[in-house]
Amino acid sequence: MKNIIVIKLGGIAIENLNDAFIQQINAWHLENKKIIIVHGGGQVISNLLTKNNHSTIKIDGMRVTAKNDLPIIYDALINIVGHQLLERLKESNLEFFQFKEKIKELVSAEFLNKNIYGYVGKVKEINTMLLEKMLSRDIIPIITSLGVNEQGEYLNVNADHLATAIAKKLKVEKLVYMTDVPGVIEKDKTLATLTINEAKTKIENKIITGGMIPKIESAIQTLESGVESILIANNLQKGTIIRGD
């Protein structure tokens, strides 16, 4: 379905959603674009864990998750971040569906490495039929970064990886990573475009560093699966567009 746009929102991006974001969502809707929104929890999860006297440990950027952390993480993702996002998006007058318990029907996951990360999952399967049914009715799904394993247990899933998995599975037109930076930065300037080979070279030459590396690597894999373009930005219009060579 080439008219689908997947938008991944980080915690800071959700806090800073502005009228321009709502206007762009409405504009895409008028162009008959189908939209899917994926979000994580970030600092909200950390704050709620701390409030409940649970520690936050990260290994390789992944939040180590104990089984008794999951009710708190669920609460942060669904009842705080997801609810806040839904209330903001309602200003567009479009129809949205927030995945809560129904996430069990959408995202199948398995342990990433239980011995190291605990109840952290990697995406195993996406129920694309469920998404396509919603999109055909002009409903915009709001999907949080959780998955469910074969035992029916919730697993904490990386939101970037979940958005990538959905984009690859549906072979969407565009994937947007909304972050707290305007795009890929080189010499204090935002790069307008990047090809796959240029991106790989900039990683090798340490021009692209830190938290941007996994985003770029995910972008490359997504493009190679058939997605047309990826936008990394702090808005929906202008940032760094990555395309195939």
Swiss-Prot record:
InterPro entries given in the database record: AceGlu_kinase-like_sf, AcgluKinase_fam, ArgB, Asp/Glu/Uridylate_kinase
GO molecular function, one term: acetylglutamate kinase activity
Family: Belongs to the acetylglutamate kinase family. ArgB subfamily.
Subcellular location: Cytoplasm
The protein's Enzyme Commission number: 2.7.2.8
Cysteine pairings via disulfide bonds: none
A matching Pfam family: AA_kinase
Any single GO CC term annotated in Swiss-Prot or TrEMBL for this entry: cytoplasm
Protein name: Acetylglutamate kinase
Organism of origin: Staphylococcus epidermidis (strain ATCC 35984 / DSM 28319 / BCRC 17069 / CCUG 31568 / BM 3577 / RP62A)
UniProt function note: Catalyzes the ATP-dependent phosphorylation of N-acetyl-L-glutamate.
Gene name of the encoded protein: argB
Reaction equation(s) it catalyzes: N-acetyl-L-glutamate + ATP = N-acetyl-L-glutamyl 5-phosphate + ADP
Superkingdom in the source lineage: Bacteria
Pathway: Amino-acid biosynthesis; L-arginine biosynthesis; N(2)-acetyl-L-ornithine from L-glutamate: step 2/4
Keyword annotations from UniProtKB, A to Z: Amino-acid biosynthesis, Arginine biosynthesis, ATP-binding, Cytoplasm, Kinase, Nucleotide-binding, Transferase
